[in-house]
Amino acid sequence: MTTNNLVLAGTITRSRRFDSPAGIAHTVLMLEHKSQRYEAEMLRNVYCQIQVVLSGERFNSVTENLKAGVEIQVEGFLNLQQSRNGQNRLVLHAENVELKT
C-alpha cells in the first residue's frame, strides 16, 4: 500500500450536513488554509481551499461545532471526486478532526 495521509489546518468557510440514502451521516466542509512557508530559501505565501468530508457516527459529537469561521485541523486521506458536470477535484476525507478555537 502506498502512503496517502494529509494534515491540514484552516478555517471553515462553508458547512452542510446530510444523511445518505443508506442512513450514513455526512458533513461536507470547505476548508481555507493560509500560511507562509520557506521554499528555495524564500518565504512563500501559501493558500488553498479544499473540500473536506466527514462520514459516520464517530464525528457526531463534533459536527455541531463545525460552522463557518471555526478553525480546525483535519487529518485524513485524499481522493478524487468527479462532479456531475465531469469536473475532477481532490477531496480530503477526514479520519480525525480537532477544533483549534
Swiss-Prot record:
Question: Sorted alphabetically, which keywords does the UniProt record give?
Answer: DNA replication, DNA-binding, Primosome
User: Where in the numbering of this chain does the SSB domain appear?
Assistant: 1-101
**GO BP annotations, alphabetical order:** DNA replication, synthesis of primer
Under Gene3D superfamilies, the record lists:
Nucleic acid-binding proteins
Q: Does the keyword Coiled coil apply?
A: no
Query: What are the record's GO terms for cellular component?
Result: primosome complex
The record's annotation in InterPro entries points to: NA-bd_OB-fold, Primosome_PriB/ssb, Prisomal_replication_PriB
Domain of life, per UniProt, equals Bacteria
* SUPFAM superfamilies reported for this sequence: Nucleic acid-binding proteins
Q: Name one GO molecular function term.
A: single-stranded DNA binding
What is known about what this protein does?
Involved in the restart of stalled replication forks, which reloads the replicative helicase on sites other than the origin of replication; the PriA-PriB pathway is the major replication restart pathway. During primosome assembly it facilitates complex formation between PriA and DnaT on DNA; stabilizes PriA on DNA. Stimulates the DNA unwinding activity of PriA helicase.
Protein family per UniProt: Belongs to the PriB family.
HAMAP family (UniProt xref): PriB
Assembly and partners are described as: Homodimer. Interacts with PriA and DnaT. Component of the replication restart primosome. Primosome assembly occurs via a 'hand-off' mechanism. PriA binds to replication forks, subsequently PriB then DnaT bind; DnaT then displaces ssDNA to generate the helicase loading substrate.
What is the recorded name of this protein? Replication restart protein PriB
Natural source organism: Shewanella piezotolerans (strain WP3 / JCM 13877)
